[in-house]
Amino acid sequence: MNTTATQLVPAAALPKQLLRDMRAAQHRIWLQAMEFHSEGPAMQALLEAACAAAARGVKVRLVCDPHSYANQPSIGRVVRQLQRAGVAVDWCGHGWWGWPVAGRSHVKIYCCDDTVYLGGGVNFSQASFANHDFMLRYRSAEVANRALGAAHNLYSWWARPDYAVAVSATDTLLADGGTRGQSIILEQACALVRNAKRVWYVSQFAPSGRLASLLRRSQAEVVAFNTARTATSLLDAVGYRALNYRFQAHNQYLGDRKIHAKYIVAEQADGRLVSLTGSHNFNATGVRFGTQETAILTHDQSLGQQLISYARQLV
């Protein structure tokens, strides 16, 4: 598989980099995230670029979870404007009627021709660009095609099987299809921590269940997740208190900026690094609700070192 070096793009730098890629695109643009909010200067520039690309014949598709309708009265008007400009807008997820947090699509994939962003948690919104977060940028037709294949496979009102597919010589894309109680990503996280000599853990939420037990017994160099202090809404504050309190004594994060990155780096007995990074928060709550997720399992040593440096900067 031919691929260039993977680039870690911080959330703050993503709008400008993605905008350049969108403006250069000649064939396809795929923008997928759980949350889509159109307000803000960076988002306005990105949406204008999407419309301009559609006008020059590029196939442009925006895919997001219906959760985006929450607290955003103008979204119907924005969607109609995008559709009139030639941008296809689709809604994904497989929610259960009457239970709004179930069956959500938490996937983040951005693709412009053969450049694709994976393995991070950045939503398609102005507020998301201010979080501690990132995306991994690949420049490879093979990686882009396989990532979009995964996106199409997950695009269903019904839960899909979990699966894994190699996207490069060092990287494998893992996908949770949304079956309640089942997560190939969480299983892989447990396997990494169980066999690790040292561990670096960063997430929006504390680990739970078996992963939490394994992490307590591991040599954890960095453990960083949010507290109620970093909450940007009442719902966030309640969620952090409810999901993080049992593991709070192990938390090393003292900052005020929201952590939205989600990854684990595990040092093996031979000193090599294996990393797992993506949209999964490593908390079993989303698994019980049947959330669709994607993550990258990578043996790239340079990327592993970048992720360790990122974790150290948080504490």
Segments from the language model and where they lie:
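Charged, low-complexity intrinsically disordered terminal segments
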Residues: 1-90, 96-315
